[in-house]
Amino acid sequence: DLPLTDHCPGYPSLAKFLANAVRDATYDSLATPRLHPVKFIEVMGRDAGWVAAACALGFSDSERDLLPLIFMPEQPPANAEAALAEISDRVNRDGFCVCVIPETLRDSPGRHFGGDEPLSIDAFGHPYFPSAAAAMTRLVQEKLKLRARYERPGTAARMSVSLASSVDQEEAYGLGWAAAARAATGASDIMVTLDRVSDAPYQCAIGTAPLSQIANRVRPFPNGFATTDGRGITDSFRAYALPLLGEQPFPDYARVDFSRIV
């Protein structure tokens, strides 16, 4: 979510990991919806929906009916009751709900679902709050009387080398080389960046930007990348993000058409 760059190194691999994990979690719920009708997946991202949005990338056109319910930080639910109503509607419609939430899920007034007392504060002044997914799981069990569970991939999502994007690996090497070359010439107070040249075929060029315009700033998830209700992604985001994941990032899954079984 850094400004002045198309994306950050590491994001493509994180996106690939989470897109696969959420798709797998959805097929698990599809197979056994009564085991846990509600499943929360808590992901990194305090104020911007880049990571949460990536969780919906693994679903093909024929799987659009399986898309997860995503609560973007930029478009939070009005309150806990509103969030529960959306989850309940999805369960009534599909028999289950896979819900992606940011680690610091808040309601419209800014109250943290996990509690407003931070557990810790990092060197940059970023507070770390109790798990939003744990709090939402309790609410679903208490208010909706449904079985629920939550998953927290945590840092595993950004350090799984076995699922790294080939595009990410190539770009990270190029960025490191470019940064070292500029440092060798005495350049300072800059960050090497990725500048999008084209989507199809995908191409990014390496550039630079002043560090003073990047540090401690956040690039919000664009309105055009999220659906109007803030609970899903648009084809514009798919066109932006899918090329970052490399070739064939998702396995093919078969689905049984139960309507044709006699």
Per-region residue spans from a language model:
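Glycine-rich, charge-decorated loop segments at or immediately adjacent to ligand/cofactor-binding or catalytic sites
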Residues: D1-H7, S160
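C-terminal non-catalytic interaction/assembly regions of soluble proteins
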Residues: H112-V262
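Sparse, context-dependent recognition of short Cys/His-centered cofactor- or disulfide-binding micro-motifs
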Residues: P3, D24-T26, A83-A85, W177, ...
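Accessory alpha-helical/coil subdomains and C-terminal extensions
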Residues: C8-R149
